[in-house]
Amino acid sequence: MDVITTHVNADFDCLGAMVAASKLYPDALMVFSGSQEKSMRDLFLKTTGYALPFTRLRDVDFSDITRLVLVDCQHTSRIGRFAEVARRPGVEVHIYDHHPGSSGDIRPSGGEIRDCGSSTTILTRKLMEQGIEVTAVEATLMMLGIYEDTGNLTFPSTTPEDYAAASWLLERGANLNIVSDFVSQELTAEQVALLNDLLKSLRSTPVNGVDIAVAHATLDHYVGDIAVLAHMMRDMQNLDAIFLVVGMGERVYLVARSRIAEVDAGAVMRVFGGGGHATAAAATVRDQTVIQVLGRLNRLLPELVNPVRTAADLMSSPVITLPLATTITEAREILTRYNVNAMPVMDGERMAGIISRRIVEKALYHGLGNLPVDEYMHTEFLRAAPDTPINAIQDYIVGQHRRLVPVFSGERLVGVITRTDLLRYMYTGTQRNAEPVYDLGSENLPVRRREVVHLMNRHLPRPTVAMLRDLGKVGDELELPVYAVGGFVRDLLLGAENDDIDVSVEGDGILFAETVANRVGCRVKSHAKFGTAVIVFPDGLKVDVASTRLEYYETPGALPTVERSSLKMDLYRRDFTINTLAVKLNAEGFGTLIDYFGAYRDLQEKTIRVLHNLSFVEDPTRVFRAIRFEQRLGFPISRHTENLIKNAVKMGFLDKLGGRRLLNELVLILREREPVKAILRMSGLGLLRFIHPDLVLAPNTLQVLDEVKKVITWFDLLYLGEKVETWVVYFLALTSSLPDEGFWGTCTRLSVSEHYREKLIDMRVHGEQVLEVMTRKAARREDVRRSDIYFWLRGLSPEVLLYIMAKTRSDEVRRYVSLYVTQLRGIVTHITGDDLKTLGIPSGPRYREILDRVLTARLNGEAATRDDEMRIAVRLADSA
């Protein structure tokens, strides 16, 4: 195993060099040997758009390391636990360091140590020489290393190679805006004076609902790095957008910085002949005064600043409503069912008012449950339109303590904005303004929306990406928002393969699927009751399509009732936060990741977390799903979620779980790559008793389960091309300690179909009987012929054969089964019943008896040819 590491208290040069080294050693793990500098920690805290592929120190098996790659370090005293690895005989050590005068105590067998501004430069040159490309994200991280160790390419130690490396990285998309935000710079006296002048002139003006800050100054000499001042003023004053206009000699310099999508700094600067990104840009104007440039800027801003976000951007649709005649008691049930705190009340098609949970609870307290909601609903409310600015809605909800704002198109109710919607919007805005959150893969986006097109292009086959774009185009034609959702998106972010593509449509999912089928010429199977469909493409790829919907549960453990809903409500009904991500597929915004519930954070923290505290009460099968995801992904269940599981077990909610649903979850667990770990977790949480009251994970049962994995691996390596239902083998092993009555009871509890129940019982009974016979023979060391083995095991399925091998403690019995599977199972006689017929033997049971006797001879080496078999058949016929 290869490992890339660096010195303790790592800095940006360490980070950049490690990233570069990972391109030269693509199979290596990147591991920090210890702590990092504060600037590094800040980077990891603020960077949410890209999962940096580092392995935790505690997850490394040091005994497996065969090659150690050290960057920016040559001393064992600075690499923590990796020192013993570097000293271990047989370990190959490569060092890349830019301190040639610092001879260390490690004798490298490879790498490069030479004088230049940064270790990252050395490795960047290697990539340039070998023609190895890097992504924009990698280029940015590497540029951070070069800039930090060369003082933004100004230290005396800086070499032409550092400039060349920086140029190469810039050509590959290195983002200098991010670099400048993380590499600290000291202000000169001239910059401090200019900063003071700019702060005095700073004015903020609303433009299209957006506050735009503009500051200006005039100098008779040149002062460099105005961009640094723009960053400082933006942070000091907590500004969304700022424009600096500074006259120096015969030129006017403009610098723009923006944190919000409504202001595209690059677009504004391009009008002045400059350029840049949406978040950072600059321009230089000749032959004009500062006053002239300010005037032109003020005239341009209303044209170039996009209007602030409106109600249409924030509202949830379709709307869940209450009829006017709904009673207070019924209203409480409906508010609880949909997990909302306020709901519009409708008089036919007209909205008559709003009822809140607080009013409902108070009315019930006073014994008014039988009265209709129109007696106590709010009848005065803001009537927002789709184009109502968010700040007006914010003033209403916050200023008047309202829970809900309805949105109307004319007189038709088209959506609602809840207090939660507004808080989430305000939270993302505050997070963005107070402290930048960086998406290294794109531009400084809000916390809960990110661009993941680069991940789609990196991890998905090209035909799949093209297909997803085509789905978005069909959505555009039908004016339907279309999203990839769930586990497919989760695994996309994790870089894991997942061919199960789920698509949610805000609207008629069946119409969407049928339209796709007509466009592409593929098959579609619809389920009108649930609003779902499956699209089967000509190449065999399947896409599951569903109308966005919500679910509610009449009683704990019951099957859900389904209704049409919005994307947000559709995602809220899911089991865990990590499965609530969506990626937009429509052309406008293709590849935008939507995260309502902090799923991205939980993916980064590797945590399984439910969305609400009643999740396991509503659907106890989620308990088993939590364990399955925990073991598959290696993500621990959060402490709070585990406490909720224990509560569901204690309160007996799993007793109400239907057998078929429990069986489905158990089968999925037993089909996992490491089901024994999940079974151990189930045992630890007291879940096995819900399968059968007497089912426990005794030591002998655990031993059988461990053996199952070994025998399945053995069988797979035979390459027989035979499919084995591995879950059946694990199921037989899990229940091996139960008596026959207990096994039958388990099948009944799990509502196994009558046909399959008989099949499982037959497997169990015959398997145990054969195992007992073979064990007895082996224990007595009786002479066992090949034919004995054949007839003992003939007719048993591969699942039963593997179960026998796993359960037996006898090596001799394992040899019997192995011999049968590898040599005996396929042996048949040369002669058939037709040959017996030519001998004049009447058809009937005698045929099977003779053919079995002939087969016995063949198995035992007493009949090698067809003629040998015919002679035996004739002899048996004559003796009859």
Swiss-Prot record:
Residues 315-373, 377-435 form the CBS domain. GO terms for biological process: tRNA processing. GO terms for molecular function: ATP binding; ATP:3'-cytidine-cytidine-tRNA adenylyltransferase activity; metal ion binding; tRNA binding. CDD domains: CBS_pair_DHH_polyA_Pol_assoc (cd17772), NT_ClassII-CCAase (cd05398). InterPro entries: A-adding_TNT (IPR053794), CBS_dom (IPR000644), CBS_dom_sf (IPR046342), DDH_dom (IPR001667), DHH_sf (IPR038763), DHHA1_dom (IPR003156), NT_sf (IPR043519), PolA_pol_head_dom (IPR002646). The keyword Chloroplast does not apply. The keyword Iron-sulfur does not apply. ATP binds at residues 487-490, 574-575, 579, 619-628, 632, 661. Its cofactor is Mg(2+). PROSITE patterns: CBS. It catalyses: a tRNA with a 3' CC end + ATP = a tRNA with a 3' CCA end + diphosphate. Keywords: ATP-binding, CBS domain, Magnesium, Metal-binding, Nucleotide-binding, Nucleotidyltransferase, Repeat, RNA-binding, Transferase, tRNA processing, tRNA-binding. Transmembrane segments: none annotated. Belongs to the tRNA nucleotidyltransferase/poly(A) polymerase family. This is A-adding tRNA nucleotidyltransferase.
